[in-house]
């Protein structure tokens, strides 16, 4: 009887211990993504790191192999790399950090390729993916991610040597096309080949650097990818003027940031930070005139900038500060300023806005549009 009582005591203690452990684990996992970000003090953002105009380490003396999240990289080099990441996708991350911390530099960048990007989100290694990712139905419903608003309307194109006389996909019959694996470009190319009964060969490569290395070596006669990526990578080729992007467009490629779908608050935060960039341009608010606009009597501007500072402001309802839109504009500007800085005519990788103009652009209306802030 005594032995049974001792056993029961130990059993009860074990149960209580397990319950306590489960409770602690539950408490830890119950923290929202916003709370976790605030506690650690920075945003974890996944970018490519090797795509000029979108996300690129602007350091000539840093080898591209240093971007592979190597834990053995000396801290001074790591910090130098982190401070030198620039681009359109990078500025999306900086806008999110600005809204949360009032500091655009409160970001740590992880350099990821197309194959690992979704695992990085689902595993919690990154809080947001800003990596020229195409929004598709398969990704939307099959992977545990939620897409933010589209930030760049793109299409799939083909890069060839100008002297090759190739002017269409059909002209590549019997030739080799290089494409990055695990991308919509790869699947679209396979569909085109089957649908049109074409005879080119598809060479899939995981590393984008290998795609262009083999292309320059003549092992493939064309590269296919998003037109924006072709345009920016074209600048990195040894003789850029010897190559052209064909006029033929193979697909629609709406590019958007993405987050994990298990935290609705975080989904809404990222969504309305992106919309804030667009709304700021629509309202004519930019880095230069922000302070002047704060004196406006326009109710739309008052509401958007959170000038009343009330508890029911847009920012407060998201879990952010009432002036979150002001923070974004002050540090990174509006959507148009981000585009101009990274992809505008005076940038190192100019790409015409075209479809990425605001919907109400009088000369060339685009598709960029924000729901009402009310």
Regions found by a protein language model. Give the residues of each.
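Bilobed "Venus flytrap"/periplasmic-binding protein-like clamshell domains
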Residues: 44-53, 78-100, 134-135, 154-210
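Ligand-binding cleft/hinge of the Venus flytrap
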Residues: 56-64, 68-73, 79-82, 94-105, ...
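C-terminal motif of bacterial Sec signal peptides marking the signal peptidase cleavage site
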Residues: 18-21
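Bacterial N-terminal signal peptides that target proteins for export
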Residues: 2-10
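Sec-exported extracytoplasmic/periplasmic mature domains
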Residues: 38, 97-105, 122-126, 134, ...
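Extracytoplasmic small-molecule ligand-binding "clamshell" domains
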Residues: 27-131, 320, 335
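Extended ligand-binding regions for polar small-molecule ligands
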Residues: 23, 27-28, 34, 92, ...
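Acidic, polar ligand-binding/catalytic clefts
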Residues: 62, 94, 98, 102-171, ...
